[in-house]
Regions:
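Short, charged/polar "capping" segments at the starts of alpha-helices
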Residues: 10-17, 83-85, 162-165, 229
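Redox- and metal-dependent alpha/beta enzyme cores, enriched for Fe-S-associated oxidoreductases
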Residues: 27, 31-33, 69-72, 83-88, ...
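Glycine-rich, acidic loop regions that bind phosphate or pyrophosphate groups
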Residues: 1-43, 144, 169
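Flexible, charged surface loops at secondary-structure boundaries
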Residues: 1, 65-70, 147, 212-215
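A structural signal for isolated positions on well-ordered beta-strands in alpha/beta enzyme cores
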Residues: 3-5, 73-75, 126, 153-154
Length: 244
């Protein structure tokens, strides 16, 4: 088999096999030449940007990764959550496991799948999912009352629609009404959803509210700052100026 050297911010190599794979710590990348790194060099350059734009979507992913405790099981939603966590994650705490799932239509059934993966884990279980993915699976929490699991944390990143489509170049030139339809824009709150299933609820713009949560299932609604998000991605797309 082909030998692979993997430089990662976590212990996960991203490969299905362990043979002929050397996994090196993320810090190794600092000793390499930027000219050979491409996007990875840009990731290092944007660590300060993630901190500066802490209320942006990628900034929130970085903050969430910092407060999720060791030994947790984390389920990442499709579309932007998994991409932004992959970008923003600096390191993982001991024993943190990551899961993801691709529904038949992409984002369907994610809350249900999260609850299924949580059933066998007695530590904290975190779902980080987009608003449209949540709307596709509103009935999922019916099973929570039968699970006897006090540490379920459902984080809904509510950016008012499918914002991944706003980053598709071919769609940017469309008329505004067409873009609104494609993005499925809305102004919904997920508090009534939490109330319907008897779950605790908090909407926050301060990650410190998520430290030492009560041992009860809870819906956490986060509304990222759209201007910070747009500025972050605009800076991200700027070319990396490499030293000669």
């Amino acid at each position: 088999k082909i030998r692979v050297t993997n430089i990662t911010r976590s212990a996960f190599s991203g490969l299905a096999r362990a043979e002929n794979v050397a996994t090196l710590p993320w810090e190794t990348i600092r000793s390499l030449q930027c000219s050979t790194l491409g996007e990875s060099c840009g990731m290092l350059r944007f660590e300060p940007e993630l901190e500066k734009f802490a209320q942006s979507e990628p900034g929130w992913m970085r903050q969430l990764a910092q407060v999720i405790p060791a030994g947790s099981r984390v389920f990442l939603g499709n579309s932007l959550p998994i991409r932004e966590m992959n970008l923003a994650l600096q390191t993982t705490k001991p024993g943190v496991e990551f899961f993801a799932n691709r529904g038949a239509n992409g984002i369907d059934g994610l809350v249900s799948t999260f609850l299924g993966t949580s059933a066998s884990h007695r530590g904290e279980c975190w779902l980080i999912v987009g608003d449209l993915s949540t709307l596709y699976d509103l009935a999922a929490p019916w099973i929570i009352a039968q699970m006897d699991h006090p540490k379920l944390r459902i984080v809904v990143i509510n950016n008012g629609g499918g914002k991944i489509f706003s980053r598709v170049n071919s769609l940017r030139a469309l008329p505004e009404p067409a873009r609104a339809v494609i993005e499925n824009r809305h102004s919904l709150s997920f508090e009534p959803w939490a109330q319907m299933w008897g779950l605790e609820y908090v909407q926050t713009d301060d990650v410190h509210d998520l430290v030492d949560l009560l041992p009860v299932p809870i819906v956490i609604e986060i509304k990222p700052d759209p201007m910070q998000t747009e500025t972050f991605w605009r800076d991200w797309q700027k070319p990396v100026i490499r030293p000669r």
